[in-house]
């Protein structure tokens, strides 16, 4: 048994809310195992970037619009309780795609990268395939391993406090909790006795939150 998964790119020029809602409805109608969703990135030198420069295409950077499109796509995907948010950029059908290799990698397990652009680590050695002729290897420090795990578990909408206590030391946990309290006040996170759970808006800003909290904790530790 296999899984059929799709990538959905949103926030392209002149895209309407109806477009992202229709994309979500198609994914559900076809019972696709999972949909990864990403805001459009315009790469320098691409045809789109040249068309924008030549003013053939109008492309406005509007974070409110980006979030509005994201929110409507997610809301439609979750309507009916057939799908759930599996990871910051992936919504999966219940009983479908389990994203096992990402779960292994993000919790500190060994994953050996093969294709160009792939990255992973094996027994504390980081590996990155830069191109078909060159690979980059690095020895991971104890801090790098632990904070990579922290970044990894923050790729998921529910962050287990037990997992955090297995990664962070007592003082680091205190600083982490300080930042989570700040996020909760902003409506990005909800806390209970066992977990921190990202809200829909928190998932949208998830990678920013992850980077922000890691920098905050490390600055508190090293800048005493």
Residue ranges with predicted function:
Residues 145, 198-203:
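Basic, amphipathic "hinge/linker" alpha-helix immediately C-terminal to the N-terminal HTH DNA-binding motif
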Residues 1-170:
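C-terminal scaffold of the Radical SAM
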Residues 169-184:
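Short amphipathic alpha-helical interaction segments
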Residues 87, 184-194:
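A short, conserved structural fragment
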Residues 74-78, 184, 210:
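Structural signal for well-ordered, non-membrane alpha-helices
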